Amino acid sequence: MPQILKEEIKNRIYKAAAKIFYEKGFLKTKMKDISEEAKIPVGLVYTYYKNKEELFDEIINPIYYYLNLAIEKEEKEEGSALERFKATGEEYVLKLLNQHKSLVILMDKAQGTKHENAKQVFIKILENHIRRQVQKKGIIVEEEILIHILASNFTESLLEIARHYENPDWAKKILNLVTKCYYEGVNSI
């Protein structure tokens, strides 16, 4: 089979799986559903992916990549939290939001996979990021729960943008409003 055809079939499987996982979640999705959406025999799906979990992982892996890259790049920057975010973090968060369906699949549709606690993992990653930045600035946080609340609120904000995603410009506009509130307070809008 020519390489172009193989890639085209794999791409059809990927798109079909993303659509079905987004609609039904991991638990209710069958490989037969994916093959029907891709308009190929179910056996051909198994030629490209050994099981549903492998296909699911391929769809959601970019989310972890962009989250970790955003944090890594932002932590190398100098300046205020907002300046650091604008300098580098925003670019990667927008890339993450461009994968909005994958983000929703990971956070809302992963029950039955090794990723079913992804939202809590995401929050923990952000908590550690906030904690490192607070320590770097020598700030003492009176109540540790504040760091959790900030991380949780930011995570939920990103998820709401992903769940209601309209287009890249809209996502950037809403992300700018959210980060302005997040870093400067509600009175800043």
Regions found by a protein language model. Give the residues of each.
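Amphipathic alpha-helical packing segments from all-alpha helical-bundle domains
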Residues: N68, A87, L94, N98, ...
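N-terminal intrinsically disordered/low-complexity leader segments
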Residues: M1-K6
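C-terminal peripheral helix-coil segments that are non-catalytic and often amphipathic
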Residues: L94, N98, N128-R132, I147-I189
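Helix-turn-helix
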Residues: R12, A16, I20-E54, E58
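Hydrophobic alpha-helical connector segments
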Residues: E58, E72-N98
